Amino acid sequence: MTADEEETFTTFNEFRSDTFTVPTRAMVEDGFMNATFGDSVYQEDETTLRLESKMCEITGKPAALFCVSGTMSNQIGLRANLVQPPYSILCDYRAHVFLHEAGGLATLSQAMVHPVRPSNGNYLTFEDVLGNVTYDDDGDIHAAPTKVISLENTLHGIIIPIEEIRKISEFCRENDIRLHLDGARLWNASVATGISIKEYCSYFDSVSLCLSKSLGAPIGSVLVGDEKFIRKANHFKKQSGGGIRQAGIMSAMAIHAIDYNLSKLELSHNYAKQIGDFCQEHGIKLESPVDTSLVFLDLKANKMDPNRLVELGRTKYNVKLMGQRIACHFQLSQESVDNVKKCILECLEYHQKHPHKDDGRNNKKMYSLDAIKK
């Protein structure tokens, strides 16, 4: 057993997000003992350059750019894919770049967003794209042409099949449309499917990969693409206040996360599967399949009050919940996973006797917002 495995984490009962993962002792030691202290804005920090080079090897892309967050790597990545308005970005209606990045596409990219509801209820297909894309040369000047399609894999923990990605990629290349991937949890998709990060990335012009969520680094995301694209993205990074001077400490911890925590993601998938299977066994409806590390309860169908679920978890079961989404990570304890099951079941049994009527107050909370009403 390694030192990391023996370590007890303060996040053992944290189910709100995998962003709550904390650095391990070994990761912190790497950050402060093995980092260089060059200026990364001048591209003179050896550790950051080593991280970016490592990400190029993993993804198969020629260039990489270390950013402070996934929001930044997504937003500057999408902006760097665009040239001259008018233009639009097509994405899933639940996409993080659309709903949860503080309106970045409207401010930084000045882009119209075309959100699409997947016809299968889970992930965008080639047919969904084909039915919603706006062509640049079809003679209709009323709409903003689709210049970027942004996919997210995983989205709500759901894996987009590689066959769909391949077809969408071929379509984009044939129609001069750039294809971006919000791969914040692409690591999870790769671990679950056995498909390499490099193969996934080969179908995209740009990819954003988070180092903080499932991998547990304290900060950071990396944007990858070709060299010209990354040079352009670096301008937008600087413009957005994202230039980091002594980035070596953060980069060293990120390298440690890739080297030592990637193999632990399967544990987070196992925890989520346990919760998902438990829900199915007890007739608790889920919004989507549990492909990886996230479980989404269908609170409306179950007539459950998210506030009661959160409060019950806090006061009786010592678990931290955030309503419908249950996020699993490798720093959880099995006891806490079991407590989440008990908490969900008790909440369901209460609401079977006292059904909760949704008054709409929770509809604008994170991961409950529906921008396209049915």
Curated annotation (Swiss-Prot):
Keyword terms: Lyase, Pyridoxal phosphate
Region annotation Disordered: where it falls in the sequence: 354-374
Pathway: Amino-acid degradation; L-threonine degradation via aldolase pathway; acetaldehyde and glycine from L-threonine: step 1/1
Catalytic activity line of the entry: L-threonine = acetaldehyde + glycine; L-allo-threonine = acetaldehyde + glycine
Family: Belongs to the threonine aldolase family.
One Pfam short name: Beta_elim_lyase
Gene Ontology molecular functions: L-allo-threonine aldolase activity
Enzyme class, broadest EC rank: lyase
Gene Ontology CC annotation, any one: cytosol
Name of the featured protein: Low-specificity L-threonine aldolase
Keyword field contains Lyase: yes
Subunit record text: Homotetramer.
InterPro entries: ArAA_b-elim_lyase/Thr_aldolase (IPR001597), Low_specificity_L-TA-like (IPR023603), PyrdxlP-dep_Trfase (IPR015424), PyrdxlP-dep_Trfase_major (IPR015421)
Modified residues (N6-(pyridoxal phosphate)lysine): K213
Needed co-factor(s): pyridoxal 5'-phosphate
Gene Ontology BP, a term: glycine biosynthetic process
Organism encoding this protein: Candida albicans
Enzyme Commission identifier(s): 4.1.2.48
